[in-house]
Amino acid sequence: MTDRERPEPTTIQPVGRSVSRRTVIKGLAATGGLAATGGILAACSSGATPAPSTGGGETAAPSAGGESPAASAGGSITFGSNYSDDVPKNAMQAVVDAFTAKTGIEVAVNTVDHGSFQDQISSYLQGTPDDTFTWFAGYRMRFFAGQGLATDISDVWSEIGSNYSDAFKAASTGDDGKQYFIPFYNYPWVVIYRKSLFEEKGYSIPATWDDFKALGDRMKADGLVPLAFGDSDGWPAMGTFDILNMRLNGYDFHIGLMAGNEKWTDPKVASVFEKWRELLPYLQEGALGRTWQDAAQAMIGKQAGMYFLGTFAGEQASEADRPDLDFFPFPTLGTEFDSELGIDAPIDGFMVSKAPKNLEGAKEFMRFLATGEAQNIFLESSPNNVAAANDADTSAYTPFQQKMAEIIGGSGAIAQFLDRDTRPDFAGPNGMQGFLQNFINDPEQDLTAYLQTIQDFWDSLV
Amino acid sequence: MSSTPAPLPAAPGSTTRPRQRYSLLTRQDKLVLAVLVGIPTLIHVGLVWIPTIASVILSFSSWNGIGGLENIEWVGLENYQRLPSYPPFIPAVTHNLMWLGVFLLIATPLGIFLAVLLDKEIRGTRFYQSALYLPVVLSLAIVGFIWELQYAPEKGFINNVLGTTEQGNLIDWLGNRDLNMWAVLVAASWRHVGYIMLLYLAGLKSVDHTLREAASIDGASERQTFFRVVFPVLRPINIVILVITIIESLRAFDIVYVINRGLNGLELLSVLVTNNIIGEAQRIGFGSSIAVVLLLISVGPILVYLNRAMRDQPG
Amino acid sequence: MTAIARQRAVPTAVTRERRSRLPRALLHAFLISVSILWLFPLLWAIYQSFRPFTETAAAPVALPQTLTLDNYTNAFERMEGFKYFFNTIVIVVPAMAVVLLLACGIAFAVSRFSWRFNLALLMLFTAGNLLPPQVIITPLFRIYLALPLPEVLNDKGLWYDSYFGIAMIHIAFQLGFCTFVLSNYMKTLPKELVEAALVDGASVLRTFWQVILPLCRPPLAALATLQFTWMYNDFFWALVLMPTGAKRPVTSALNNLQGQFFSDTNLLAAGSVLIALPTLIVYFALQKQFVRGLTLGSTKG
């Protein structure tokens, strides 16, 4: 629900499409090539920056050396994907095609729209899931791993581990200390704006809360809505809660609250909503009836000056407008936690289901997805994220991406996002989604009673 | 479910025929008859009644839906005790009641009123009927979309006509929780009125004509004729329409689900049940307890309906 | 109903005399305004569906400068052509045929049993038909996850996520209404027909096929029209029981198309009109059947 493209289309990839005759032939050729070289894509040795994929099926993969698990793999695997919007869907297809070209393993992609995929993840994983599937790091990954619904891929990690930072490894590790997840990319939640608008009006980037509000006042005087806002889907408002809580109360308190170690009735939480009230005069009205896509359009269309959202908002911009988008981190609030630079930067990635029909093929796919090469292919078509692997080629990053990498790298406290950091039933439509909408609808309500309701709901779940 | 089916009971004055039993049946014939009855009964009971009973049983349990039945934990009445403090529960009940109130007090009477008007011999009655009835053939999901085009904040028809599309005076029809349920009810009534109109019109057509003429000759006004003569005669149909109105109010789901998945002021019991099973974390037991509440409310009108419909069954 | 309508075709002099011209004009004025009000939302959707996005964005309520079919081609493309319509057909046509056949069978058979049994069965079916679907969905969902299905019918080998499963729940739910209507109808058939057939030595099955079924053509036609519309319009069952987006019938799939369409209301309008089209066509072509289906219970005798 965090996630990007929440309300969006089902566009299912017909299984047959990815198995067009052309790819089959290419795949066969690739298998031959691989057999000849004996090399297999696996993890790359750390730091190595492979040449960006040149597209040829016969390109030998960087090899971590050693055995060749793929030689026995072959065949085909299935892949449940939630990349259903046009841009990421095509990007994912390019990754899959490159994998097939490389290994000869056919991938049948089952694309389900983002929202439905998440809603049905539990029954999907218990029923007859695809061999591999897209998912998110954090509590949400650990929950399903803990229920035995995912395959332990620690052996894959032992090969690819050096290609990731410790933070990524930790985010991929279940409660039992084993790894279940391959990080693919992440993206920060930041304040996005159009450079041309800021230049035209002579606005400067606000660093502190007061600067931020002063800028908002100027924008209002200029007839702009300072901050675009849309929360009809329930989750975008969580980003605002997260950032205010981390900046006011610190990362540790935020994560503790998500895990249930802190209470919602704590006055610290009330202070978050009090701060939120200060933002209200600057926020776009009618947020509860507006999707994030429409809110992004308001910022891109220059009716609104700024928009606090994940960088995926960039997907809403046309090709021509995209270079004009820029962003800055949420301003500091003048607390002891300012130096943490806490931020939401959710990680998206992949898992292997509990009993894949083709385990070797699935692991092979995981190894491929853990390469900078695969991540570069994806980011080429969808430059609104940054790659997770160390060996990803960052030289091709747009300035937008370089800045994302900088902000994430500069943060000392990275959270995943409210609905990835806490229990799904607590974060869901009848829980936090509804509670935050309730606050937006009536921000002046009595906070004591409001927060007590939230705490009671938490208590009823555990 | 798009519409509650409406088998109207026998029209007043229909004749029934005494039934005879036959004994011309061979053993094979009896077997065939048993199969003809058995298969549909099996399907219906298996997929409708067994789940209904299971809903009741599961409502005493706690289960996140993962693993087999052995993972079910029995918690007695705990789910029910938690219902009143479950934040969306009271709003959902209130909204279902609002839905019922609007249907009963506005939509259904309007449908009846239109049926009475259309029952006169007037020119173009077919056009009027078709226009009013048109929304009924649309799915409730499509009805939701069509009305979103009316209610959308910046691009919707209504706000543009009212001139309320600007920051400061924007009317957020579907987002403001003081407004959105009423906005949805307009859309739902748009469909319900036509449905009731059609059913009632059929009922009116079956009223013995001489009754009205007699009243008319006695000097009764049209209104008097309707309320004193026609309406009482149509009692069976009135009851059916009442029941349909209640059941439709309890079934309400599709429109709010396509608008915002039943959040933020559009909570309904049916949505709460659904959200507890589709979602990342299933709360099977708790969701079932809400389903049981829905069941208990439905039982009353269903019994009234059965009583009515079956009384008219020829013996 | 038809008989009554015919009877009423000649209005009596008394009623005609009592009506003056003015109220009649008022009545028409009222009915015309209500009709326009009723048609407006749909007409607006149709109008929007022909306008280009840029024009609507600039001036949502305005006379058109250009009208285009682009929204339709675009919507059709994004809905991947007939895919979802095909899913609907695969579910609805067999479900409709089976439910009518089964309902005919049981309606015929119960008329051979004791009255008490007959009534009990009818009550069970009708009550089931009236339940809100959400009352049964939670256990049904688990049952569907547990019931096996040959791989021919569903590659996942379960009722869950299969066309078959969706068709079955439609059948189970709609059986009540169809049985009720058909059993009422059959009671109006002359008993002598069945008796004569049986006396002639025809088996029950033959009597059913060759005597009863042909006689039931009128209610079957009406029920088929109605069932098509209801099953086509169903949103809920597939939403819960069919997780694979590509297999969903068109009405449920629409929900997933919404996100894509949301910022582009013209596209949303075109998508809605496209999806509403089959039911509108059925309605206009078979209006009489449609209305008869809904009111069948009252027409017997």
Annotated model-derived regions:
Chain A
Residues A150, D155, G301, F312-Q316, ...:
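Mature extracytoplasmic/periplasmic domains
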Residues A98-S165, S196-A207, A298, G305-M306, ...:
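Extracytoplasmic "Venus flytrap"/periplasmic binding protein-like
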Residues R218, M258-L288:
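Glycine-centered hinge/linker elements that transmit conformational signals in sensory
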Residues S63, Y180-F184, W189, K213-N261, ...:
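Extracytoplasmic/periplasmic solute-binding protein
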Residues G174, L257, N384-N390, K403-D459:
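C-terminal capping/gating helix-and-loop segments adjacent to ligand/active sites or protein-protein/ligand interfaces
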Residues D97-K102, E200-K201, E274, P281-Q284, ...:
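Extracytoplasmic/periplasmic substrate-recognition and gating elements
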Residues F136-W189, K213, T240-D242, D326-F328, ...:
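Hinge/lid segment of periplasmic solute-binding proteins
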Residues M1-S20, A30-A43:
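N-terminal secretory signal peptides
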